[in-house]
């Protein structure tokens, strides 16, 4: 367990904004957690759990508390039968490493297990996946999530929680709502995957990719490679550009609202989803810069920090985008990344 003081949040998050955290503790083993929480309790300081920092925005006032940076690692097979396999990954592993591991396993008939291949190249850690119920290209983690192991800081003990206890929804779980916020440190995640390949029709852009190439076999590796190529063509490389990935949530409409939207020429996808990127782009904002934040010219739902020096700059840019979409379409966009610290 490593401990540091006065660490800029900007160094811990991919948007590269935010003041200093009073303490940062790196959690390298499960047994570190009791000591780390005891330290915070003795200091009477709040805690915050951070993985790769790709879905968190640091605020200018910093965090007068203790940030736990997740450094737990390890991926392994728990059990399997002829049709499926259960994989466990420690929460500090990259989600993409788990996906890569799953598509390279021999399943008895061919290479790879299916269930999370469309989540390829999503930035962030395994532990963050159930918090936000991450999803992309037609898959969500809740579709394959079996269970999680957590440290409950309220009860000061480790617990095993099944997926159906987590209230998983669109970017929603018990971990980011109500009393569950900050209560649990996820130490590992178990997914249950199957050997049967995905079948068309796929998510719109993924199906178009396969149609253009005449793809007929949809092995987990083929789907992973396709998603990786699509994401690379649309999304900024987090190693090169400061961003937090998808910045705005999609809009979800009921049946009546969906019909009204379609009558106005607004695309509505399965489940009543209106893509926020389409709204932003068609409001004329793609590639535009506000207060040092640029709307990506590849995918309009992404904000890139070109020269912003403060959370205040980001907040003004965010509001400019929200106002423009609201004025043109009447929908109010919501931010997807969480925020850390005081304004």
Predicted segments — roles?
Residues 1-155, 165:
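Anion-binding (especially nucleotide phosphate/pyrophosphate-binding) glycine-rich loop
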Residues 4-5, 11-17, 56, 158-313, ...:
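Phosphate/pyrophosphate- and phosphate-bearing ligand-binding catalytic cores of soluble enzymes
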Residues 321:
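Phosphate/pyrophosphate-binding loops and the adjoining catalytic core of nucleotide-dependent enzymes
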Residues 325:
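Conserved ATP-binding N-box helix of the HATPase_c
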